[in-house]
Curated annotation (Swiss-Prot):
SUPFAM superfamilies: S-adenosyl-L-methionine-dependent methyltransferases. One of its GO terms (cellular component) is cytosol. This is Ribosomal RNA small subunit methyltransferase G. NCBIfam families: rsmG_gidB. HAMAP family: 16SrRNA_methyltr_G (MF_00074). The keyword S-adenosyl-L-methionine applies. It is an enzyme of class 2 (transferase). Signal peptide: none annotated.
Amino acid sequence: MWGYTVEKGWFHVKHEEIESIASHVFGGNVDKAYAYHELLATDGSTRGFIGPREVPKLWSRHLLNCAVIGEAMDENIRVADIGSGAGLPGIPLAIARPDLTITLIEPLLKRSVFLGEVKEKLELDNVTVIRGRAEEKAVREQLGLVDVATSRAVAPLGKLAGWSLPLVRLGGKMIAMKGSSVHEELERDEKMIWKAGGGKVKIFSVGEVLEEPTTLISIRKVR
């Protein structure tokens, strides 16, 4: 079993319970989740992709709460992870949902190189890495239209919709991880979302198995 750090102040549980939660979320690919945790805690931290204070919180704040967003996605669809960074949420999602075809979009060279290394080391055949920004024409042409565009902590909601919805087919949607400010962002950025082609909005939680479920906002592309 891959090594990992049991964090304090979030789970308040034993090693066995963390293993149980990880096994539930990642299923038969749980060993790949441990391997990814190890890469983030070592290379990811050394190369500046994960802050030292975040390393003890990798399971709760990064791997598990990202993986559970798959609960909001249909089977066998194409997903784009915008501003993937160290691979969040795209890599945990790809591990938990091998039926998904996931493209990680990341503008910085050093991060995109790391993502490529993770893909190879974990043998994630359902993952592709594109270096660039979601709003760039070349990226959009290379990607094509996807069913879902997802992201975490990338930008305010209105700007995020402007990046995400153009990548999505008509009838598809963007699914963003957001915190408690999501309602205020939605009210503030309503016009920007509409301009980007957004329609029906849904705010909901996934990951009931977690102590702190993940809050998502889903916006369907209608035009």
